[in-house]
Amino acid sequence: MARALSRPRTKRGALLAVGGSVVVVAVLGFLFIYFVLFPTSSPKPLSLSSSAAVAPVSSGTTFAGRWTIATGSLAGYRVREKLGFLPAESDAVGRTSAITGTATFAQSGRAVSARAASFSVDVLKLKSNEAMRDQHIQTIGIQSATYPTATFRLSSPLGLPASALNGNVVHISVTGVFTIHGASRRETVPVEIRVSNSEIQAVGSLTFPWSEFNMTAPSVGGFVSVTNRATMEFDLRLRRA
């Protein structure tokens, strides 16, 4: 009698086990396809290092005044995804051109300095090569649906090296306040600068632990996650307002 009564529970347990196994196999199959059968290459990090120099700035060029974000500017993130403990072959990269902001320059002869600068990025418009990833970061990690804006504000005046006016790419350190995910931190970032008669271009990146800006590294179902550090990249192009 007891044996007969136990059969329904045993059968139900077996069905649950089979159902659970099917779900696990389906998830693992999807991840295998995602990471192995269809690996994607990442866009290269934003950089000016390999770019050709431009013509030296003309002696009569005036930089004093207000400059604003121009077409071609980009900002975004770069993270390495993982399948369990196995890193993917390339980075997940999301970028947007939805950037606004200005910089004010002063000039004395050939000496040029940035007196103030502030920029804002609409992180809700970040796009990668995966629509599913773009949807997930709205509610996990960056949580762009809750914190749709990231900003930077220059902390103190910044002089440009004299060699910047020779058309060469120069390397400087820029200190300012980054506000990401609603948290603000003062950071110093290495930046590449290139100056022409009509445009000032600044390219750089900031790598940080997710927790530094009160974020939690994204994880989807415990199967797909990212490493514990993220990189913010930017390529800002400024033209006279």
Name what the model sees in each region.
Residues 2-241:
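Low-complexity, acidic/polar, glycine-enriched regions of mature
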